[in-house]
Amino acid sequence: MSLQIDAVILAGGMARRMGGDDKGLVELNGKAMIEHTIERIKPQVKEILINANRNQTRYAEFGFTVLSDEHTGFLGPLAGTITAMGHTQADYLLVVPCDCPLLPRDLVARLLAAIEANDAELAVASDGEREQPVVMLLKPSLRESMTAFLEAGERKIDFWYAKHRFAVAAFADQPNAFVNVNTPEQKQRLAAEINQS
């Protein structure tokens, strides 16, 4: 029996470093940032959910279900992940940010292989040097644990997954896969890179 894997694209943040612009909707090479992310992950998953706390109507135009955080107050990636976990029946949920337009085309396969090889509950991506806490594959059954962690006042996703059996999938062969956009300067650099990928 093949596993069902859904994805959530996290676009629920405040984007303070981008001058408050909604990062998923910032244009990059003629497309909204989130469109690049969708193109990368769509062939790898069954359903895509978008977590957004503003501009929901605009995000809905991409043709996917848009979910706002159940926990209000812009509480970060944990809140968006918890919300998505409550809206999927899949075996695993892929979590990615909206501003990583160069995500690996084999992201799911390698995260899943890491889970299976280590009998883990979730796998986190690494660029070969640093873990990427908001790029992970996890079981939706972990929702209760994540909710309790958030409601205890915690926000850091890596502190949460450290409490579980987690594996790391290294993508040292794709060092730019997780480059994201936090400043207009990074956006310019990334635009050039996308043209070459």
Swiss-Prot record:
Residues annotated for Mg(2+) binding in this entry: D99
At the top level, the lineage of the source is Bacteria
The organism's taxonomic lineage, starting at the top: Bacteria, Pseudomonadati, Pseudomonadota, Gammaproteobacteria, Alteromonadales
Location(s), subcellular:
Cytoplasm
Which of the seven top EC classes does this enzyme belong to?
transferase
One GO term describing the cellular component: cytoplasm
Q: Name one Pfam family in it.
A: NTP_transf_3
> What's the gene?
mobA
Enzyme Commission code(s) on record: 2.7.7.77
**Function text:** Transfers a GMP moiety from GTP to Mo-molybdopterin (Mo-MPT) cofactor (Moco or molybdenum cofactor) to form Mo-molybdopterin guanine dinucleotide (Mo-MGD) cofactor.
| Source organism of the structure | Shewanella sp. (strain ANA-3)
Q: Which Gene3D superfamilies match?
A: Spore Coat Polysaccharide Biosynthesis Protein SpsA, Chain A
Q: Which SUPFAM superfamilies match?
A: Nucleotide-diphospho-sugar transferases
In terms of one coarse class, where is the protein primarily found?
cytoplasm
Query: Quaternary arrangement and interactors, per the entry?
Result: Monomer.
What's said on domains?
The N-terminal domain determines nucleotide recognition and specific binding, while the C-terminal domain determines the specific binding to the target protein.
Protein name per its UniProtKB record: Molybdenum cofactor guanylyltransferase
